[in-house]
A protein has these predicted regions:
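Short segments within alpha-helical structural elements
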Residues: 61, 206-231, 385-442
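Bacterial Sec-pathway N-terminal export signals of envelope proteins
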Residues: 20-72, 78, 233, 239-275, ...
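Small/polar, glycine/serine/threonine/aspartate-rich low-complexity segments that form flexible
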Residues: 22-23, 70-112, 242-247, 292-326
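Periplasmic alpha-helical coiled-coil/stalk elements that build and connect Gram-negative outer-membrane
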Residues: 54, 147-258, 373
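Bacterial Sec-dependent N-terminal signal peptides
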Residues: 1-28, 36-39, 423, 429, ...
Length: 444
C-alpha cells in the first residue's frame, strides 16, 4: 500500500513538472530569429569577427612606441683575456704579445630603451589588409546566417509536413477502424464473408504501425529543428505557421545581381586582399625609418655587494638616434614573390567567371526544379482528391450491396498511396522553394 502511494505521488510530480514547462510558440520567422541568436555556427562566426578585430588592433600596436627595460647582473668567474703589444706593459720584453685579463669580477647593466617607427610601408599596407580581413570575416558571418536560415527553414517545413501526415494518418486510422467494425457487423449478420473482415483487418493493422511510425518521425523532425535552432532537445515547442498553397507565391524572382549572393561579395573581398598582398611586396623596396633612444647605467666592481650601491658604483649613459634601412639587393627574392602573387590574383579573376557561370547554372536548375515540384504537388493534390472520391463511392456501393469488399480495400490502398505521394511532393516543393530563394540571394 505504501509503495503504491509513493508511485502515485511520484507520477503526479512528473505530470505537474511537465505541465509547468513552458511551450515556446514559434512561427518560421521567430524560429529563424531564434537560430540567428543561438545556433552554435552563428556564435562561432561572431567570435571570428572578434578575432579579426583583435588582428586589426594587433597591427596597430606594432606602429606605436615600443619600450623595453633590461637588467643584467653578472658574476665574471673567468675574465676574458685580450692580447696587447708588450710596449704597453712596463717591463715586458719588446716585440711580443702579452695576455691581459680585462674586466671586473661583478658587472651590471640596467637600461630602458624606446623606439618609434616613422615610416614602414609594410606596416601601413598590413593595417589596411587587417581591416579588409575583418570585412571578410563579417561576410563569412553573413554566409553562416544564410546557411542556418536555410537549414532551419527546411527543418521547420519538415515538422509541418510530418504533422499534417500524422493528422491524416489519424483520420485514416479512425476511418479504417469504423470500416472494420462495420464489416464485422455485416459478417455477423450474414452480409459479408470472413475473408472480407480479414482484408480490412490487414489494412487496419498496417495503419496502426503507420501511425506509430508517423508519431516517431514527427518527434525526430522536431528534434532536428531544435538542433538547427541551437535549442535544448528537451525543450517544448509548438509551430504556429500553417501550410497552405499560398506559401508558394512569395518566391517569385525579382531583379537579380551577382552582388546579392554573399559568395560573390566574399570573392570581391578576396580580390582586395590579393591586391594588398601584391602592394605589400612592392613596398618592401622602400626604405624604413625608425627613431630610437636608450637610457641606463653600468657598473663594475670586485664585490657583489657593491652592485647594489647605486650612488657610487653605477655610471649613467644615454643615447638617441635615427635608423634608416634601405634594401639594395636580395637576390631577386621580392621579384619572384611578386610574380607568384600576381598569378594568384589572376586565379581570383578567373574565379569571377567560374562563380558567375556557376550562379547562372544554379539559378536555372533551382528555378526549373521549383516550378516542376510545384506542378507535381498540384497534380498529386488532385490525385489525392480523386482517390478520396473513388474510395467514398466504392464504400457506399459496398454498403449498398452492389460492390465488393476487395474493391473497397483497393480503393483504400490507392487513397493512402495518393496521400503519401502528395506529402512527398509537398515536402519536395517546400525544399525546392528554399533552394531557389537561396540561389537568387533572397533567403536572408
Amino acid at each position: 500500500m505504501y509503495k503504491k502511494t509513493l508511485f502515485t505521488l511520484s507520477l503526479s510530480f512528473v505530470v505537474l513538472f511537465a505541465a509547468a514547462q513552458e511551450v515556446r510558440q514559434m512561427s518560421l520567422q521567430e524560429a529563424t530569429d531564434y537560430a540567428l541568436e543561438h545556433n552554435q555556427n552563428i556564435l562561432n562566426a561572431k567570435l571570428d569577427i572578434e578575432v579579426a578585430e583583435g588582428v586589426v588592433k594587433e597591427n596597430i600596436a606594432t606602429g606605436l612606441p615600443q619600450i623595453n627595460a633590461n637588467l643584467d647582473l653578472a658574476y665574471n668567474f673567468s675574465l676574458p683575456v685580450s692580447f696587447l703589444p708588450s710596449e704597453f706593459i712596463p717591463g715586458a720584453p719588446p716585440g711580443e704579445q702579452v695576455a691581459v685579463a680585462f674586466g671586473t669580477k661583478y658587472s651590471g647593466n640596467a637600461s630602458v630603451g624606446a623606439s618609434q617607427m616613422v615610416f614602414d610601408g609594410v606596416f601601413f599596407v598590413g593595417l589596411e589588409a587587417a581591416k579588409t580581413y575583418k570585412e571578410l570575416s563579417t561576410k563569412k558571418h553573413i554566409k553562416s546566417k544564410i546557411d542556418v536560415v536555410e537549414a532551419v527553414s527546411k527543418a521547420y517545413y519538415a515538422v509541418l509536413v510530418n504533422k499534417l501526415t500524422l493528422e491524416l494518418v489519424e483520420k485514416n486510422y479512425g476511418r479504417l477502424d469504423t470500416l472494420l467494425q462495420e464489416t464485422k457487423e455485416m459478417y455477423q449478420n450474414g452480409f459479408a464473408e470472413k475473408i472480407d473482415v480479414s482484408r480490412v483487418q490487414v489494412q487496419f493493422n498496417n495503419i496502426k504501425v503507420n501511425r506509430e511510425n508517423s508519431t516517431k518521425m514527427l518527434g525526430v523532425a522536431e528534434s532536428l529543428l531544435k538542433f538547427q535552432l541551437g535549442m535544448p532537445i528537451n525543450e517544448e515547442i509548438a509551430l504556429t505557421d500553417e501550410l497552405t498553397l499560398d506559401i508558394f507565391d512569395d518566391a517569385k524572382e525579382g531583379s537579380f545581381g551577382y552582388e546579392q549572393r554573399v559568395e560573390y561579395s566574399i570573392l570581391q573581398t578576396q580580390e582586395r586582399l590579393a591586391l594588398l598582398d601584391i602592394k605589400r611586396t612592392k613596398v618592401e623596396y622602400l626604405p624604413k625609418l625608425d627613431l630610437y633612444a636608450s637610457l641606463g647605467a653600468i657598473a663594475g666592481t670586485g664585490s657583489g655587494a657593491n652592485l647594489f650601491n647605486i650612488g657610487n658604483e653605477w655610471f649613467d649613459f644615454g643615447l638617441a638616434g635615427v635608423k634608416m634601412s634601405v634594401p639594395v639587393f636580395d637576390g631577386l627574392r621580392k621579384h619572384r614573390v611578386l610574380q607568384q602573387k600576381k598569378v594568384k590574383l589572376q586565379q581570383v579573376h578567373n574565379n569571377y567567371d567560374l562563380l558567375e557561370n556557376s550562379i547562372n547554372l544554379e539559378i536555372e536548375q533551382k528555378q526549373v526544379a521549383y516550378e516542376n515540384s510545384v506542378k507535381t504537388m498540384n497534380v498529386q493534390l488532385e490525385n489525392m482528391k480523386l482517390s478520396q472520391e473513388v474510395y467514398e463511392i466504392t464504400k457506399e456501393k459496398y454498403q449498398a450491396g452492389v460492390g465488393s469488399n476487395l474493391e473497397v480495400i483497393n480503393a483504400d490502398a490507392d487513397y493512402k498511396q495518393a496521400q503519401t505521394n502528395f506529402f512527398i511532393a509537398l515536402y519536395n516543393a517546400l525544399i525546392a522553394k528554399v533552394d531557389y530563394k537561396k540561389s537568387i540571394g533572397n533567403l536572408l
